[in-house]
From Swiss-Prot:
GO terms for cellular component: cytoplasm. It is found in: Cytoplasm. This is Phenylalanine--tRNA ligase alpha subunit. Binds 2 magnesium ions per tetramer. Its EC number is 6.1.1.20. Tetramer of two alpha and two beta subunits. Belongs to the class-II aminoacyl-tRNA synthetase family. Phe-tRNA synthetase alpha subunit type 1 subfamily. The lineage of its organism: Bacteria, Pseudomonadati, Chlamydiota, Chlamydiia, Chlamydiales. GO terms for biological process: phenylalanyl-tRNA aminoacylation. Mg(2+) binds at E257.
Length: 342
């Protein structure tokens, strides 16, 4: 039998072996049989050395062509077998959703932050506010400049704000909704803006680098400070489910004038407890009348229109409503904690 006849016989036998290989292991065995260190094609090396010089080129080309054919068939067959095996494995792992679920696998529920956030927004919607959102990644202009933060204001510094580049930040408050909405909508406007905020702070029991905030603002003719205080009283009465006393302390915020810190009476009724640090009061929000400069930057005449704005931290409200002492619990994914609110 000549080498050419032998190669043809090998191709026929190889085709038979491949057709009977139905798994990756079968194909690997075929590959070893033909292409392995002790495989069939290794035997042709000795035959090629014994060939007359004038036949070596032709014989070598025939051997290589046959070997290449074997490699290509193995590759294509391997793809088909692998796809078949993956499909079979997928069917084995597929969950039969028609089966009844385990009673132990209870349905999940809203995270306590989501629950409180929805409750807060729902109250403002009942008060006639529209829900609006803005990006977490914000321009320095919308986050600071349009809200009357001067260029040297401490809040702009790297130690308080996460800068992505010299003019882009992770928003430090949801007040960026105010700068955007006042620029595109003329009064009257009543907006509530929920969302995540980011500040470069040390993580502790009372502060975190990521927190949730709701800002609400109203701009119209003849809006007064009493409109703000009456709205706050109504909100906290509904949210806490009890009548609360409010206390206002003068404070400074660049985007409002006058600015106030809002405190509510503690459930200890002034007796003093660890929650209120024995003061009888709980700090819940910052608020005030929108600064005339903010209105001017939005092309709104402060002589004709006025407005109020307020911001409240959702984690803070959740901690007060449910008696939670550590803000870090909200992000630790401890089911023992989370299941209390689902």
């Amino acid at each position: 039998m000549t080498i050419q006849e032998e190669l043809e016989a090998i191709k026929q036998q190889f085709s038979c072996d491949v057709s009977l290989a139905h798994s990756s292991k079968d194909l690997f065995d075929v590959k070893v049989k033909y292409l392995g260190k002790k495989g069939i094609f290794r035997g042709f090396a000795d035959q090629l050395r014994k060939c007359p010089i004038e036949q070596k080129a032709t014989v070598g080309a025939s051997i290589n062509a046959c070997k290449q054919y074997v490699e290509e068939v193995l590759l294509e067959r391997g793809k088909a077998v692998l796809a078949k095996e993956e499909a079979e494995e997928f069917l084995k792992e597929k969950i039969d959703i028609s089966l009844p679920g385990s009673e132990e696998a209870a349905l999940g529920g809203k995270h306590v932050i989501k629950k409180v956030l929805d409750d807060v927004v729902d109250i403002f919607v009942r008060f006639g506010f529209c829900v609006r959102e803005a990006p977490n990644i914000e321009s320095e202009k919308n986050n600071f400049s349009l809200l009357n933060f001067e260029g040297d204001h401490p809040a702009r510094q790297m130690q308080d704000t996460f800068y992505l580049d010299p003019t882009t930040v992770l928003r430090t408050h949801t007040s960026n909704v105010q700068s955007r909405e006042l620029a595109r909508n003329k009064p009257p406007v009543r907006i509530v803006a929920p969302g995540e905020c980011f500040r470069n702070e040390d993580v502790s029991a009372r502060s975190h680098v990521i927190f949730h905030q709701v800002e609400a603002f109203c701009v119209d003719k003849d809006i007064s400070f009493s409109d703000l205080t009456s709205m706050l009283a109504g909100f906290y009465h509904i949210f806490f489910g009890r009548k609360v006393e409010l206390r206002f302390r003068h404070s400074y915020f660049p985007f409002v004038e006058p600015g106030i810190e809002v405190d509510i009476s503690c459930e200890c009724h002034g007796a003093g407890c660890s929650l209120c640090k024995h003061s009888g009061w709980l700090e819940v929000a910052g608020a005030g009348m929108i600064h005339p400069n903010v209105l001017r930057k939005a092309s709104i005449d402060p002589e004709e229109y006025s407005g109020y704005a307020l911001g409240m931290g959702i984690e803070r409200l959740a901690m007060l409503k449910y008696g939670i002492s550590d803000i870090r619990l909200f992000s630790e994914n401890d089911l023992r904690f989370l299941r209390q609110f689902s």
